[in-house]
Amino acid sequence: GFYFPKTSLIYKLFLKNKDSAKSLLGCNYSCYKNDMLAINGYDEDYGETAVGDDTDLEWRFKSYGCGIKSVRFIANVFHLYHHRTLRYSINSDLALERMFKRKEENRYICDTGLKQH
């Protein structure tokens, strides 16, 4: 990726006020440990990655009161190539339905997560 320091002309002219996507992407996000503990970490009830883990975490962090801040073009990312893994053992529609139900009920603390370990 490209890195533009906040003091650079390119950042000041083009990126500073750019409305970049403010969503959590699993390959490159960070959070405070206490925030992750507060929502009980990743929701292990989904099993394998059926609903994007990052999608589930994003709405749960927001419901808990955390803001999402984009560091696009500011933070470097190195992602190693890998083939996509096909997951046949998961019903994605059922997992999405479960996530939307929990979101509707504002259940941002998952039942099966870090506290079980």
Model-derived regions: residue spans:
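Active-site donor/metal-binding and catalytic loop motifs
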Residues: D45, V71-Y88
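Alpha-helix boundary/capping detector
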Residues: K62-I68, R87-Y88, E104
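Alpha-helical architecture
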Residues: K6, K12, G41, V51-G52
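Short, flexible segments with low predicted structural confidence
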Residues: T7-L9, K18, Y29-K33, V71
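Catalytic core of nucleotide-sugar-dependent glycosyltransferases
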Residues: Y88-K115
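A C-terminal cap/extension of S-adenosyl-L-methionine-dependent methyltransferases
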Residues: Y3-K6, M36, W59, N91-L94, ...
